[in-house]
């Protein structure tokens, strides 16, 4: 799991490279602007003195002005080329980041199926600001903005700590404590239940956040996986919201399209917690659907009876999760109220999806990746093509036209004959 360290090492020089190129671009921009101002002044002087001088002088001045204009145009083109190089540099690093994220998610899924969904859902929950609960009816009319800047005195000293940071620290402390107590199976139930309750009692409106990653696997590598998950949550919590949610949207789209289902691959230690995979899958499905902003009315279902039973089992599981205070009571309630959910195929894998708003290119209608070649036909509807899709292994010499434009040019040539 060295993807993060490798990527950070790769982009270590990126800020300095961008700064140097932006500085160079700014210098070229000023150079072009100064040249245009001088040329404008020379043109005005030329027209003012044109009638007083000989035709030879006018021709000489006109040639000199045109030459300087072409020089300014070349500088402007060079500035545009530099901007394109900067864009390609950043885009290449973004694609590399997407690839490393996909590898990291697959490595986590190989050890614990479904762990990335829980981590990403918790990250979104940390991003979502929750309104502070005010128990006094006398202050119920106070606006939310005012309560944020003027906290009540009855909340104590913890009001000075941001809620998002507090919940992140509580989550990380729970994960690390579960990982350290993995080797004591006799006290696993008590430790997991007590740490879970202590960590998430601060937010009673989210009872489903009290899952224990320490109980995800009972194998010898469970402690390492839990520690890796804790580090992943910590790194994700420290990222900016824009960059963090970009990769999460793809996972939620895959989950909503039934490309990914939690089944028996979600290996829980049944000897310690007694959770059933179907109960946890139904609970996660209900939680994900309730947090999504998309409407359920537009979704198509193949079997209405199965979907209704799943929704009822999810609601009952959610109510039991919020009412139980210990893991043993939670396991007993879930075992009595859950229904059977169709399990996903064990060989199914999560397909890495790109941003749906990213433009598509080439005859394969896919996003930009790898080496691409541009069609020299200005009216080409596709414009950019992958090397492999058009049978290229290196950059073509001279002008290059795509197969569609080549066929169209041949048809036009045959008509003229």
From Swiss-Prot:
Pfam family, one: ING
Locations listed in the record: Nucleus
Source organism superkingdom: Eukaryota
Chain intervals annotated as zinc finger (PHD-type): 359-408
Gene3D superfamilies associated with the record: 6.10.140.1740, Zinc/RING finger domain, C3HC4 (zinc finger)
Binding site for Zn(2+) 2: 375, 380, 402, 405
SMART domains found in the cross-reference section: ING (SM01408), PHD (SM00249)
Coiled coil: none
One Gene Ontology biological process: chromatin remodeling
Site (Histone H3K4me3 binding) location in chain: 361, 372, 376, 384
Keyword entries, A-Z: Chromatin regulator, Growth regulation, Metal-binding, Nucleus, Transcription, Transcription regulation, Zinc, Zinc-finger
Regions of compositional bias (Basic residues) in chain numbering: 136-152
One GO MF term: zinc ion binding
InterPro entries, A to Z: ING3_PHD (IPR042020), ING_fam (IPR028651), ING_N_histone-binding (IPR024610), Zinc_finger_PHD-type_CS (IPR019786), Znf_FYVE_PHD (IPR011011), Znf_PHD (IPR001965), Znf_PHD-finger (IPR019787), Znf_RING/FYVE/PHD (IPR013083)
Basic and acidic residues composition bias: residue spans: 156-168
Ranges where the record places region Disordered: 128-203, 286-320
Domain remark from Swiss-Prot or TrEMBL: The PHD-type zinc finger mediates the binding to H3K4me3.
Function: Component of the NuA4 histone acetyltransferase (HAT) complex which is involved in transcriptional activation of select genes principally by acetylation of nucleosomal histone H4 and H2A. This modification may both alter nucleosome - DNA interactions and promote interaction of the modified histones with other proteins which positively regulate transcription. NuA4 may also play a direct role in DNA repair when directly recruited to sites of DNA damage.
Subunit structure as annotated in this protein's UniProt entry: Interacts with H3K4me3 and to a lesser extent with H3K4me2. Component of the NuA4 histone acetyltransferase complex.
Family: Belongs to the ING family.
Protein name in UniProt: Inhibitor of growth protein 3
Species assigned in the record: Gallus gallus
UniProt gene name: ING3
């Amino acid at each position: 799991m060295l993807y993060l360290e490798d990527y950070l090492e790769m982009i270590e020089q990126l800020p300095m490279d961008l700064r140097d190129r932006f500085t160079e671009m700014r210098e070229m921009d000023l150079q072009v602007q100064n040249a245009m101002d001088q040329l404008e002044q020379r043109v005005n002087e030329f027209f003012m003195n044109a009638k007083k001088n000989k035709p030879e002088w006018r021709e000489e001045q006109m040639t000199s002005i045109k030459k300087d204009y072409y020089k300014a145009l070349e500088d402007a083109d060079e500035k545009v080329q530099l901007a394109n190089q900067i864009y390609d540099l950043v885009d290449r690093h973004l694609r590399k980041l997407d690839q490393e994220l996909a590898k990291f998610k697959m490595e986590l899924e190989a050890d614990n199926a479904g762990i990335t969904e829980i981590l990403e859902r918790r990250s979104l929950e940390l991003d979502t600001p929750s309104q502070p609960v005010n128990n006094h009816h006398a202050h119920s009319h106070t606006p939310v903005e005012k309560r944020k800047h003027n906290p009540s005195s009855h909340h104590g000293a913890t009001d000075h700590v941001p809620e998002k940071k507090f919940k992140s620290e509580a989550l990380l402390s729970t994960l690390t404590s579960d990982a350290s107590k993995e080797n004591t199976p006799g006290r696993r139930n008590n430790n997991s239940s007590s740490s879970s309750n202590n960590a998430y009692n601060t937010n009673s409106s989210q009872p489903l956040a009290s899952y224990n990653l320490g109980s995800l696997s009972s194998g010898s590598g469970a402690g390492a996986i839990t520690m890796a998950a804790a580090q992943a949550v910590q790194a994700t919590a420290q990222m900016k919201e824009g960059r963090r949610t970009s990769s999460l949207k793809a996972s939620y789209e895959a989950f909503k399209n039934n490309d990914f289902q939690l089944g028996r691959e979600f290996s829980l230690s049944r000897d310690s917690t007694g959770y059933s995979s179907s109960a946890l899958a139904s609970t996660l499905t209900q939680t994900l659907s309730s947090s999504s902003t998309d409407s359920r009315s537009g979704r198509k279902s193949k079997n209405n009876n199965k979907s209704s039973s799943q929704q009822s089992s999810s609601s009952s599981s959610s109510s039991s999760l919020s009412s139980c205070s210990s893991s043993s009571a939670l396991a007993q309630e879930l075992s009595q109220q859950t229904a059977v959910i169709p399990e996903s195929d064990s060989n199914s894998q999560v397909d890495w999806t790109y941003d749906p708003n990213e433009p598509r290119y080439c005859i394969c209608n896919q996003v930009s990746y790898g080496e691409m070649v541009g069609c020299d036909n200005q009216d080409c509807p596709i414009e950019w093509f992958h090397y492999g899709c058009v049978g290229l292994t290196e950059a073509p010499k001279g002008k290059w036209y795509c197969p569609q434009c080549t066929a169209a040019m041949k048809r036009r040539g045959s008509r003229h004959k």
